[in-house]
Amino acid sequence: AFGHLFSRQLALVEHLGFVPKQSEDERDAMLVRLEYACQTNDFRKPSGAPLLDLAMAMKEHPLSLLGPSEMQPVLIRFKNQLNENSGRFARIGVVPEMNHNELVAWGGVSDDADPAREDQATLFLTWDGLQKRVSSRIDWMIEHMPTDYAWRIHGEGTSLLEVLLHHCIVMDWLTIALAFLHGKDPAAIRPIQALKAYLADEASV
């Protein structure tokens, strides 16, 4: 569903001129690179072993997702995929805004911090196009993170669009791996189905 909806929305915003339109060669090259990312992050293959190791390290910890404002769409999607695929809660923080408040709860240079901060599994979503000051903020946070469970996931690509899609591929494999580690079918969405059935019954009254 994601690919079906996204491709049509992308075609529309390109047609309206909201984002630069890619040439056929650029689009084809991007799709080749994204297909490679899809294949190499498959945790059923040897190349996907690092992703599976990451999922195993995340399994027993509360999850935090942090990144710059331009990564906010994939931060939200990542949280949603963890909720739906893995049956896990996750929260997101956007840099630099979270540096003005949430940073206090992380501590790192002070004891005035959340008691559970050291148990957080934290993923930083980054890319080559990070604004310099934002990059410095993230580097400072990584250096002062009070948890041993912190990783940087770097989006690959020659454009922001490609980087966002690359992050989506990695998060899909990661949340599916985490689902299996928890013994959950990543396609199982019984609470959503139950809610829809309840609303349908209520509407028919």
Question: For the regions a protein language model found, what residue spans apply to each?
Answer:
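A SIS-like phosphosugar-recognition module
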Residues: 1-205
